[in-house]
Amino acid sequence: LKEAGLYENSIIVLYGDHYGISNSRNPALAPLINKNSETWSSYDNAMLQRVPYMVVIPGMEKGKIIDTFGGQIDMLPTLEHLLGIDSKNYLQVGQDLLSPQHQQIVAFRSTNNFVTPKYTSYSGRIYNTQTGEEITLPDESTTAELEAIRTAANTQLKMSDAIQTGDLFRFYTGNNLGKVHPDDYNYINSLKALKAIEKEKGDQSTSLYSKRGGVSSV
């Protein structure tokens, strides 16, 4: 980026796609994180689902760690707002992780599995997220809280499934979104298509490729 002259005008985002080791092998990691493999629990497995999300912004002199809970669907809205993009009219899911109104409920695909700052539900067990202590006999108030969180988490998943598997975009008519024809998209010849766009844009192209006179920075 520095050699291409883009570093000072780039936001760099690093995100761990998913955990790297299966639950059956997780206890072997216990000594590395000051845990005991003999007392390893589903809570520990859930905590190892965490992945890094790091953002470097031009001009940022001092970084910090922000403790908030989110998922992959929150990455785009967060980045949009860092760029100053108003996403109110965008058809998308997810929330800005930096927003005070961010609902910190992380839903897992496994049935009734979720994590919030207060509770962790994993493999049929409930834990205090802050201490890792299992909650075996929740009182009436806690049970009501858990049910509300479980409902919200399941709603997230149902909405996502409805959009993707039900192809709900076909019913959306806002923002002049036209019908999408799959045949119009061919990613096999992406380079050829991009060069055609560059040629069509001519002097109006703002890509790095054009600015370098048709020379790649790679």
Residue positions per predicted region:
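Solvent-exposed soluble domains appended to multi-pass membrane proteins
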Residues: 1-218
